[in-house]
């Protein structure tokens, strides 16, 4: 028998090849990542070691200087050290910032205190901060040391400058940037520092000088406050450059807060845009008196689309005045002057029409609430002339809840829809507050209003209430409000200023969330809270302002007037009728009338 032997050679299949390559790549990537990880650790460690060595080097320089020379060039205290410098070590670029402060130790009294320390610069704090611009994973380092004199103190020949920074609510602002210059000494003094957690910066042992210290306080996304030079244009600044007096403390307060935005549009009364409308925008804050010098006073112009956005606006009360050659202002929405709160966005519509030739703008306000008054009948007459109209709806609201709950629509303004039973509405009449059980107020309660009908599709502007100031002991917030709107009076979804159910209006004079625009009916839900049982917040009135399309609230204009003296007759049910004379001698005249309830 013949035996045949066959050799069979097998190779790798495609699947086996792919799997093998994948495994190989995983191993290679793992090895590479491990190598890079070790490399990065070594790299980061090396940069940190260099930074620590650099800090020690700077501290040794400070330690080896005479005490009188431990200070900053052009700084306070004055000395040999440089405030900011870039140092290179092994291809690393380090930014080194040195800050030195005189410290007034309370052990022997403080300047201006009891006892009064006539030599307040007891010791110095040296702070070295280092950062690296081209290092990977580098965390900035800060090292602080204390330097004290060897000898006994002697009476100081300098003074002290204490700077406090607050926000619009009076709260201290920490980490505010403070820039100080004194160019009346040689070398000039230049200090850049920040406020502490209490919003304070203390400069001890400052060289005396009259109106010598220029101070500017800033913070990212905040407004700016500063001292001003005495000039011919501003002979009496409200906050002149600081004066330092021998062995005295000069204290200055600065107020800064978050910047806001104005969205301004120039339109007709049918909401058609009017391009390139010129106007003057003025704030109410003063930087000088006798004569008054405004902090903000600028001329502006809207775009070709009739729009203008002004960012970086400081909180203030602003007035818009038309200076356009072809158009007059016939109304604004909201009513001017308008206030903008810190960190907010305010939409303003300036309603204009062509000059023809003279225009009278009549503004009617409620004498109690101070808000624009709707449905006022206005008649303007002169010999051979008569015209009449009605002011646009301005506000709806409530000043009495004494007739209780159970009313779905606000036909009786002394009633409301419902409450949780913890609201007192009759003692006193005209106010709502937390219910009192025996001698204790309940901790919280809420009330839902009847529905208010604005009469047409509306743009809702602001929610307001009084009193604004509530008992401090009740906590904060102690008054909260949510708003619900719809177009048919059906479903009510209550929301806050960001359009969600988790937020509340907690400050009076708040802008209503724009998502409510386009609706007709409104309800509010009032929440009262107290942190104690001995006091309660109270509300005497709640009201909201709105407009229908581009009809300005509480305003009416008359155009095509000739020069002369006109008679105004104004009447509205529930108010004292008024007759007023108005001279019209220029192209645009504004007359504000306050209506007093009967």
Identify what each model region corresponds to:
Residues 218-251, 300-301, 320-355, 549, ...:
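Structured interaction patches on ligand/partner-binding surfaces of diverse proteins
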